Regions:
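Asp-based, Mg2+/Mn2+-dependent phosphohydrolase catalytic module
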Residues: 1-9, 109, 118, 122-123, ...
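Short glycine/serine/threonine/alanine-rich loop segments
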Residues: 32, 113, 191
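Generic structural signal for well-ordered alpha-helices
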Residues: 102-105, 183
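N-terminal helical cap/lid subdomain that shapes the substrate entry/recognition surface
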Residues: 2-103, 110, 122
Length: 211
C-alpha cells in the first residue's frame, strides 16, 4: 500500500455542520419527509445533474435563480423547500467538534503532508465560507466547484485537484467527505476515502490511523 502524501478535505460536513443533516432536520421541523426535503433542495447528490443546486455549484446559475427554481419544485409537492430557510435553521448550531477538525488539518500541514480543499460550493457563499477557517494556512490548493465549473462526484474534479497538487498519485492521497457518493467516486480513482459523520470521532480516528 502506497504511503499517504496528500490529504484532501471537503468543506461542509467536515469543517462545518453537514447541510445534509440540516436539510433532514429542517424537513422534520416543517412536518415534511426529511429525505424528500434533502432531495428537493440538493437534488440526487450521488449524481452530477442539471438540478438547480447542481448547476449552482457548477457556477452555471445565480443563487437567487436556483433558490426560486427549488422553491417551485417544492411547491409542486406542497413542500416549503426553501434553501434560505434551511440554512437559516442551521445558523445557531454547535461549532466545537469542527474546531477539532481544523486543529487536525493544521497538524497534518505541520507534519509535511500536501493538502487540498475540494468543495462543492456557491459563488455567493465564497466570502462567507472563507471566513470560517484559515484556508490559506491549511490548504496548498483550494478547488471550489463554482470556480472550476465541475463538482463532486464527477471524477474530473479529483483529477484536477491532483494536477494542481503536482507530483502525487491517487494512491498517495486520502480524501475526507460527508457524502458517501463523493467518497466512492474518489475511491474509484484509487484515492483512499474516509466518510465523515456528524460526530467526527470515527473520521478523526481514521485520519490518525492512515497517516
Amino acid at each position: 500500500m502506497s504511503r499517504i502524501r496528500a490529504v484532501l478535505f471537503d468543506f461542509g460536513g467536515v469543517f462545518t455542520p453537514s447541510p445534509f443533516d440540516g436539510a433532514r432536520n429542517y424537513g422534520a421541523q416543517i412536518g415534511a419527509s426529511p429525505e424528500r426535503v434533502l432531495e428537493l433542495v440538493f437534488g440526487p447528490y450521488h449524481e452530477d445533474t442539471d438540478h438547480p443546486w447542481h448547476r449552482l455549484e457548477r457556477g452555471e446559475m445565480a443563487l437567487v435563480d436556483a433558490r426560486n427554481a427549488i422553491v417551485e419544485l417544492g411547491r409542486a409537492e406542497g413542500v416549503d423547500a426553501d434553501p434560505f430557510k434551511l440554512f437559516a435553521s442551521m445558523a445557531n448550531g454547535p461549532r466545537g467538534a469542527y474546531d477539532a477538525m481544523i486543529a487536525r488539518a493544521r497538524a497534518v500541514v505541520g507534519r509535511g503532508y500536501r493538502t487540498a480543499l475540494v468543495t462543492n460550493n456557491v459563488v455567493e457563499f465564497r466570502e462567507s465560507w472563507r471566513k470560517m477557517l484559515p484556508a490559506d494556512e491549511l490548504f496548498q490548493v483550494v478547488v471550489d466547484s463554482s470556480e472550476v465549473r465541475m463538482r463532486k462526484p464527477n471524477p474530473a474534479i479529483f483529477r484536477h485537484t491532483l494536477a494542481l497538487l503536482g507530483d502525487v498519485a491517487p494512491e498517495e492521497c486520502l480524501f475526507l467527505d460527508d457524502a458517501a457518493s463523493n467518497v466512492e467516486a474518489a475511491e474509484k480513482l484509487g484515492i483512499r476515502g474516509v466518510l465523515v459523520k456528524s460526530d467526527l470521532a470515527d473520521a478523526l480516528a481514521a485520519l490518525d490511523a492512515l497517516l
